[in-house]
Amino acid sequence: MEGSDFLLAGVLFLFAAVAAVPLASRLGIGAVLGYLLAGIAIGPWGLGFISDVDEILHFSELGVVFLMFIIGLELNPSKLWQLRRSIFGVGAAQVLLSAALLAGLLMLTDFAWQAAVVGGIGLAMSSTAMALQLMREKGMNRSESGQLGFSVLLFQDLAVIPALALVPLLAGSADEHFDWMKIGMKVLAFVGMLIGGRYLLRPVFRFIAASGVREVFTAATLLLVLGSALFMDALGLSMALGTFIAGVLLAESEYRHELETAIDPFKGLLLGLFFISVGMSLNLGVLYIHLLWVVISVVVLVAVKILVLYLLARLYGVRSSERMQFAGVLSQGGEFAFVLFSTASSQRLFQGDQMALLLVTVTLSMMTTPLLMKLVDKWLSRQFNGPEEEDEKPWVNDDKPQVIVVGFGRFGQVIGRLLMANKMRITVLERDISAVNLMRKYGYKVYYGDATQVDLLRSAGAEAAESIVITCNEPEDTMKLVEICQQHFPHLHILARARGRVEAHELLQAGVTQFSRETFSSALELGRKTLVTLGMHPHQAQRAQLHFRRLDMRMLRELIPMHADTVQISRAREARRELEEIFQREMQQERRQLDGWDEFE
């Protein structure tokens, strides 16, 4: 693809995303399905704007690479060790059982046994990109089903290596003798990457961060992600696995959050490009000729994987309310099938249209997942939000709540308990089904659902409520909900949780003035107690705390125009000097009235 063609393709991708995704969200079918439909529209079987699908699909796999790096940042080695049983237990069982069942079914449709084995393994894999994206959208990240789903996906990435090695053996084209020297060098290189990453990454990033230039830090992050991906690819291993390991090695470093911030925009764009590329690869010609075969294949594939996953979830002890979420989110074929089937085709394992039929089946199965998860959501909503008695009204709470609390994790629970203790009528919306189960056991009126859906908010009583308290874990969800409330329910007083200064700036820019940084107040209170233990009078420590709070809020507002700018550093230093001057000016006055308490007490 020439430079001008590549630029044109980039413009088309951006246009497709801008046009299709908002429309898909408005129709309620989700961003992922919007990307897939946009790919079909601009691909060779749609309007034909882009024909070189394979090259773009290979490039777009970087979206999965960036996603796995961010996931690695969220998992320290000890947490990964805790997941070892679910990774090598449930993960291995899912791949082996699904592959065996699907291979057997393929043999019944005139596939040679070698081709059926490869086809079964490829179809047994799930889409890492789609599953993780949907798990984040559905709030499954921290739930039991989400952790188990991630374990299965991680094992599938590990299974890529032996699966690719199996293809030439099945084709009868493998060398009679393994090159043990070559294999040994690859193992040594992999171990060297682990050791080097363990002891070199932190000092390198410390040196880069000392420069104070944000762009260099971002460049270093991109270099790490792309470099580790290319290194693993050169070893014949999974690129996504390489970046995941790099993320895990930095999970306990002081640069974890900065790394995540630097990489997040690239991850989102490239993931969108990946889904568009998958849509472009859908061969509508094969679909038209073999429509019945493809439809039956998609239904059978999804049904077999759901059955296997549901049974494994039950054996593993996953709550009944979460089993369908776990099974549904992993029910599709995955991007690895494109690589495995291409390798098998080059070894002439497939005959006629067999490879094309399998790829169409995989692509369409990916398109069914967002729709399937919507059905699961509706089923869960009816099961958990429905009437407990026959004469009760269905859905959520129809007694005109004063406050709607969105999110009922540790932060939201404190707020909810305080409001209920003061006899306030509240409706709580939570999209983590395990949290809904737990809180309902203790008598809380918590309802399952995604609060970014306008219909759910309206059903929850948003039109009659006075306030909404947003305590979402994800900043993106918080800002989306703020926008929805301002547009559809402008009368609501919006109060929000901010994870840090970045989110606080975004809330202020959106016009939300009532927010709380989750660690700020508790840190200030502990700081005040520390001052007292160091000999400062309680009144003096209290005033120091109040001054710091006022100055910090003033600085927060002043820095909005230069949000995420290097000028912020110099302004912060100036504010620190100003705070010291304020303390010095008032020390004399404080010493003269040590036993007094002011109006702010």
Curated annotation (Swiss-Prot):
It holds the Pfam family TrkA_N. Residues 400-519 form the RCK N-terminal domain. It comes from Shigella boydii serotype 18 (strain CDC 3083-94 / BS512). The lineage of its organism: Bacteria, Pseudomonadati, Pseudomonadota, Gammaproteobacteria, Enterobacterales. Belongs to the monovalent cation:proton antiporter 2 (CPA2) transporter (TC 2.A.37) family. KefB subfamily. The gene is kefB. This is Glutathione-regulated potassium-efflux system protein KefB. The chain crosses the membrane at residues 4-24, 29-49, 55-75, 87-107, 115-135, 152-172, 177-197, 207-227, 230-250, 262-282, 284-304, 324-344, 356-376. GO terms for biological process: proton transmembrane transport. Its main location: membrane. Interacts with the regulatory subunit KefG. NCBIfam families: 2a37, PRK03659.1. It comes from the Bacteria.
